[in-house]
Amino acid sequence: MVTIRLARHGAKKRPFYQVVVTDSRNARNGRFIERVGFFNPIASEKEEGTRLDLDRIAHWVGQGATISDRVAALIKAANKAA
């Protein structure tokens, strides 16, 4: 099953997440199909904290991909801000 979820990157104590489309059987930071955005939970005021390609996310949801709870919250916040 294809899912849209977060893959953790960054350094110890400084997380940075990529929003990826991947097979649910793959490891958290393993192989992915497409990167559709990023999320930086510790971004400063000057830095961009979240960027999502909502068109590609809608495409994958139309293809039957499921969305993780955290990514769903990020999408909701992005739609509210837009």
From Swiss-Prot:
GO terms for cellular component: cytoplasm; small ribosomal subunit. It comes from the Bacteria. Pfam families: Ribosomal_S16 (PF00886). Keywords: Ribonucleoprotein, Ribosomal protein. Signal peptide: none annotated. GO terms for biological process: translation. PROSITE patterns: RIBOSOMAL_S16. GO terms for molecular function: structural constituent of ribosome. HAMAP family: Ribosomal_bS16. Belongs to the bacterial ribosomal protein bS16 family. This is Small ribosomal subunit protein bS16. It comes from Citrobacter koseri (strain ATCC BAA-895 / CDC 4225-83 / SGSC4696).
